Structure formats: structure tokens, C-alpha cells
Amino acid sequence: MDILADGEYRINDEIDIGGDGISNFIFGRGWLLEIIELSKGDFFFYSDDKEVRSTTTRFGVFYPPFTIVRPHVRNVKGRVIGFGAVRSVPELPQTPFIFDTDLDGILVNVDHVVRILAASPDRRSIVLNSKLSFLSIKAKRLIDENYLAYPSISRIAARLGVSPEHLSRQFKRDYYMSPSSYLHQLRVSEATFRLAIGEEIIDISNEVGYNDLSRFYKQFKKRTKTSPAECRTMLKKPA
């Protein structure tokens, strides 16, 4: 990952994911466009429990802020280029999708991304669930707005007029994870970006709401299967 100015970054890396698995992918603040070219394996998304695939081995994936998607990967090898930023860009779409593309070469800047997406008429939605309950939508919005302050799930439930148990059941039914799990994954996503831009681990722990450094390490390793220091090293490897 190459860190640019104004919270922008560029990706140019190999993909090598062994095995066969499905899991939720959480993208926090900011947005990202990836162009993926597969040389081996299978990579698609689930939307409303249906498979959404590219028709070619080269395709784009767009993630707007605070996205939850559900990819399925099977022994994938290939390459990914990408461009993302933390700052809001009004011209960009508000929902995640994939699209076929013949784009080759790096993504230059925000304007380049806007032009590419505007010229992608074959968009296929990868929204996890298009029939979310109003309760889950409101709960997710509250978490998205307050995740760095460590919002209490019990307090969110009370604010929404339901029990924590009812909120957790409905949220998990809609998003395939509990609200607590979503909160922690969102914070780890934020921590990963901060590691990439060179912030100190102890500062990151505090900034994403973990006042206890050991708890931060535990949650980070649980979600990423690696430590913050190891993750920083991987992010800084040359493409």
C-alpha cells in the first residue's frame, strides 16, 4: 500500500489466498475501488443469499463507506490494483457493486476513479441484504457514527426501545454477525488503516477506543489472525 496525500492511498499487490471460505468483509470510513485480475481460483460475492459473479477474470469492486459484504474465495491467485481515500466524494456511489472492466495500469487519482465508475453500466450489486429491518439499519447507523467512542450495545438497544437480546438476534439475522462483532471489526478496520499510515500502535489503541493495549491486541489478532506489528510489516512490503 502506498500512502498518498490527504488520506488517499494506492494498492498494487499480488493475491494469493489458499483454501475455500466465506466471511463478512467490513470496510469502515472512506471508500475503495479495486480492480482484480484472477489467474486462478474462484472469487464471488453473496447478495440476498445469491451468488454475484463477474463474467470475466478482470473485474472491479467498489466499496463505499461502512460497507458489509460477503465474499467467497476458493484458492485464489491474481493481482489487485486499487485506489481509496478517507475523505468523502459526493460523486461516488453509495452502495457496493462489482463490474466487468478491461482497465489495465494504475488508478491515478480520485477523478480517475469517478470516471471509471461513471463508465461502468453493468454494475451488479453486492449489497449483503437488500431487505434489512429498520431496527438493524438504525443500530448500524448508530455504531457507524460512534464506533471510536466504544458505544454500549445495551445503550443502543435502550435508545431504540428494544432489549439487547432482541437487537442482537435481529442484527445477526440481517448482517450474519452480532452488533458487538460488527463494532470490533469496524474498529480493527480503522486500526489497520492507521497502521498503514505509520501511527504508533499504542496511539492507535487509544484512538480506536481500546484504552487497554492487551485488549486491543486480543481483538486485532482475533479478527486478522496476526498482530498489529506483523500487520504493519505486511502492509509496508513492496508490491
Predicted regions and their residues:
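Generic protein-terminus/edge-of-domain signal
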Residues: 1-55
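Conserved metal-binding segment of the jelly-roll/cupin
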Residues: 55-68
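Short, Lys/Arg-enriched, Trp-marked, Pro/Gly-tolerant hinge/linker segments that flank
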Residues: 97-163, 169-185
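Terminal helix-turn-helix DNA-binding modules in bacterial transcription factors
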Residues: 141, 145, 154, 173-217, ...
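Proline-centered helix-kink/hinge sites
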Residues: 179, 227-228
